[in-house]
Amino acid sequence: MKVFSEIPKDLPNTPLLDSINIPEDIKKLNKNQLTALADELREFLLYTVGKSGGHLGAGLGVVELTVALHYIFDTPKDNIVWDVGHQAYPHKIITGRKKEIETIRKKDGLAPFPRRSESEYDVFGVGHSSTSISAALGMAVGNPNKKTIAVIGDGAMTAGMAFEALSHTGHLKPNLLIILNDNDMSISENVGGLSNYFARIWASKLYKGIKKSGKSFLEKLPQTYHLVRKVETQMKGMVAPGTIFEELGLNYIGPIDGHDVNELTEVIGNLKDFDGPQSVSYTHLRAHET
């Protein structure tokens, strides 16, 4: 990830970003070009919001995730629901609104939040926080043939509405991916080689296949099955604070590095075709706005 110490005053050179008119264009890139695309997207976001005003922090924290999600999923057929509209600035830029991004918060300009009437890529009109899981749950249940993703921050997860939706998700078990965008030290302390290694294992199809076949066999031996399940849960708890997700019936992966677009595409890509509710947490450095 390229780090910027100040907001660019001149229009940056962004050849890769300039080639992206719709998310489908991202799929034409080589995977090793995604990091460069994310760097260009971050620099362009800094430049445009620096000129027009707006909220930088939330958008900067999801640059790599935005690139990864649109690279992996088939938008707008698949649904991406953003919690807190300020996260959606990068999403707007790569969904055909790059030239208009400077009009955010201006008369007759782009909305500062996702708006359904503005773009087919904005699947839910969001403003305030903590609504994404509920909205995404309804979409996932209503149309199970689509992939549905909710992106929610750690602050928004403290609201009762989010927990209620999380509990309901565990009960209904739809094909829904919940991504927790976290910049708090309580999770970031766990980010490292061991955490990333296990995250890749738990998100792999090989692990899922072994787990599924092993479960069928071990269920015939109740005492052994419960022991193995407990060990698995404890191992996940040692390297990732996902106990609450697991207890509510969601498969939990993470935390992973939210500034590593290759790791995001690998882990989330592996989860794409899994059945049932999945949850991933990722950490990032929060931008300081002045």
Regions found by a protein language model. Name each.
Residues H55-L172:
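Cofactor-binding active-site loop characterized by glycine-rich and histidine/acidic residues
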Residues L172-L180:
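A glycine-rich helix N-cap at a beta->alpha junction
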Residues E6-K92, D257, V261:
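N-terminal amphipathic, basic-rich helices that act as targeting or association modules
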Residues V141-K147, G193-V267:
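Conserved thiamine diphosphate
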Residues A88, T158, D184-S188, R286:
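Short gly/pro/ser/thr-enriched loop/turn and capping motifs at secondary-structure boundaries
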Residues T283-T290:
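Conserved small/polar residues in nucleotide/adenosyl-binding loops
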Residues L16-I22, F44, T48, P112-Y121, ...:
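Gly-rich Lys/Arg/Thr-decorated short loops/hinges at beta-loop-alpha junctions or inter-strand turns
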